[in-house]
């Protein structure tokens, strides 16, 4: 079992390998970066409360006027090459898993955009991004910008900034300490992490002056020792629910601690969404659940869905990974697996919540609708 963050790190490593091979072949700079599979940086003043996925506080009834386009091409669901572990979250109850996903089942959506994955950002554009980031944070003393074959970077004695096709990150060679009253450690409580988020937002506010940003305090699952953890990110708010969904899925900024609870890295997701295929009609969560029980889903979980299984939670998310050709919206269903493979954890009431993905666009637009065949797909 691997968490989202562990799977993401592995995907990042593989995408860099893929990008390097493509770069050598085409003599172009193609960079690789963190990849969001589900499910995993930016800022202003007011933070809403963060709450469980189906909390009563997350019952926005926003609707979108976005209509489906006509003459849309069919889409292909690409298969992974394996080796990523399965996506499972260890918790006593689904309510412990939290995030600030703006979607909920009360929101009416007729269509959502689909994008073709692009990994061809020019080296000059990436250099420009590094320069802009350094200026915003008032970082100085950088040498020339270099290309290591999978990314473009510049570094000083204390900081390294790296830009790729899908993100930019600021790495502190000597991690930044927070004041003693803040707990930013791996296993800090929800309350402590929320306080740390406010401090970090204020300290690095230069990054986030273009609007209001929402705190996405996500996580709540445990490791095999029963230790709960949360993670800090931000995404830009919008009055348009579709844009808000896009911002949440593609343009988050994360603050990452080291083992000592010090700030080690700030990274912002910036994938290129310039190649839009079109606005595709979206099915309802109920229709997606029918497809789920028909076996038409993508999962890394080791077991098939049974008719008797109950879904614990539903989310709308975009997936993107090295093997994907398109950024497509999916419904992500969580299903509890009582057997954790660890007797001690089971005695403590832990379950593993496995993730199953059903394409959210109408089935007729999927050229190869996934069908679970007993193997990791």
Where are these regions (language model features)?
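A short, surface-exposed beta-strand/turn
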Residues: 162-173, 243-268, 339-377
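Short coil/turn linker and secondary-structure boundary residues
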Residues: 2, 6, 121, 188, ...
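Disordered, charged N-terminal biogenesis/targeting segments of membrane/secreted proteins
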Residues: 1-25
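Preferential activation on post-signal-peptide N-terminal prodomains/segments
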Residues: 50-246, 250, 270-277, 372-376
